[in-house]
Every structure is written in C-alpha cells, then in structure tokens.
Regions:
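Helix-start/capping segments and mature chain N-termini
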Residues: 1-132
Length: 132
C-alpha cells in the first residue's frame, strides 16, 4: 500500500470519446470494484495531454469517464446519464441527484457539444472539461 499527494486539477480537463464500449447490462458496472478491465484499457489508451476518456455504451449513449461521473450543464440544468445506461452510481453523482442539483437524462455524443461538460468524483469534485 502506498500513498502520495493528489496533484492539483488542471483548470479545464481535456477529454476524448473512447473507442471502448460499456455493456449497459453488465451488473459489475454498478459496483465499485478493482475489476475494471474496460476502464483500464480506456485509461491506458489516453493520448498525452488528455486527462479523461468518456465511455459510451453499446447503443452509443454517453455513460461516464474512466475515473469520473459525467455531467452536462445545459439550459440551466445539470444533467447526468441514468444508471440504466450502464455506469457506476458514484458518490458525487448520487449526492448531486439527491440534493436536486442534478437530474438524469439520456445523452448522446452530439449533446456534449451543446453545453458545458463537467467530469467529477468525490475526491476531486466537479471539473470543467473540453471535448477534443
């Protein structure tokens, strides 16, 4: 077991759409586990200068990042994909939904160009992101 300080977040994360797909029917996607082969493959494939990859499911719907939940601020609303798309019910995601600060909505890749992308987790909070 090792530890080290968490480096500060870049002001804006650079993100890409991953070629790796999630299976929305996979029950393991909804459990925090160290068995994360799809996420690990997508993370290893990140080009230099890219902070995160956005994963889609088999239907092309937006799901989440490799280590983050995804949010889209559009029209005064903070949207996040529903669990039925195949994603982890993260702590930050759940707290924003329960507080009424976010709502679930099915998102497609084209939707990401019509709002402000935010990636986040309980450790780092919400981080503005730019889709490359």
């Amino acid at each position: 077991l090792t530890h080290q300080p968490l480096p500060p977040n870049p002001e804006v994360w650079q993100v890409i759409l991953s070629d790796h797909r999630l299976d929305s029917g996979d029950p393991w996607l909804r459990v925090k586990t160290s068995h994360r082969p799809v996420y690990e493959r997508a993370r290893v494939a990140l080009p230099a200068g890219v902070d995160e990859a956005i994963l889609l499911n088999e239907g092309g719907e937006v799901c989440e990042g490799t280590i983050t939940s995804l949010f889209l601020r559009r029209g005064g609303r903070l949207l996040t994909p529903p669990l039925s798309c195949g994603l982890l019910p993260g702590v930050l995601r759940r707290s924003l939904l329960e507080a009424g600060r976010a709502e679930e909505a099915r998102l497609m890749p084209d939707d990401l160009r019509d709002g402000e992308i935010l990636m986040g987790n309980a450790l780092r909070g919400l981080i503005p992101a730019r889709l490359l």
